[in-house]
Design a protein with these regions (language model features):
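Short, Lys/Arg-rich flexible segments
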Residues: 1-89, 96, 100-166
Length: 166
């Protein structure tokens, strides 16, 4: 948008021009904020759909469960962030165990190693085995192969980024 502001050499004219510049800056900030919120909401929607389609492994129950994850957008000091909450978020995003993922110490997630989420690196290192067990909240023993890295958040971000480039 190109805007012309005319200023005469008088205090009133200069003040009027400064007020107009401030108004334009405020409008631009509002438009940028709206765009950032819209982008975050699109990422959140795609991530939620990806998490809704994700699974985690639980051999003890004989099922592959559906993820209990909820995504939301939060305002930050200078923009927005997408938050995913649920007990399986980290495992579904970055993967757990060598059964479904690359060897221990590596990460199938492009940001996994950088963020410290490598296969077999969580807890007692049980993900180095093809199957292991842990005790769930009611003392039930759960046997698992782990979970494939499904990267719902990363994939959502990449999808929105590609849409914006078109």
């Amino acid at each position: 948008m190109q805007k012309r502001i005319t200023v005469r050499l008088s205090p009133r004219s200069v003040k009027s021009a400064l007020d107009e510049v401030a108004s334009l800056m405020s409008a631009n900030r509002d438009r940028l904020d709206d765009a950032a919120r819209d982008i975050a909401e699109r990422i959140c929607e795609k991530a939620q759909a990806n998490f809704d389609a994700a699974w985690y492994d639980s051999l003890a129950r004989g099922v592959r469960g559906e993820a209990d994850v909820k995504c939301r957008v939060e305002k930050t000091g200078n923009g927005y962030k997408v938050v995913a909450e649920g007990p399986e978020v980290t495992f579904i995003e970055f993967g757990a165990g060598i059964y479904y993922n690359p060897p221990a110490g590596a990460s199938p997630h492009p940001k996994g190693a950088e963020l410290g989420f490598v296969i077999g690196g969580y807890g007692k290192g049980q993900g180095n085995q093809k199957a292991w067990g842990y005790y769930a909240e009611y003392g039930n023993l759960v046997i698992t192969h782990g979970t494939a890295a499904q990267m719902p958040l990363y994939r959502a971000f990449e999808e929105v980024l590609q849409e914006m480039k078109r």
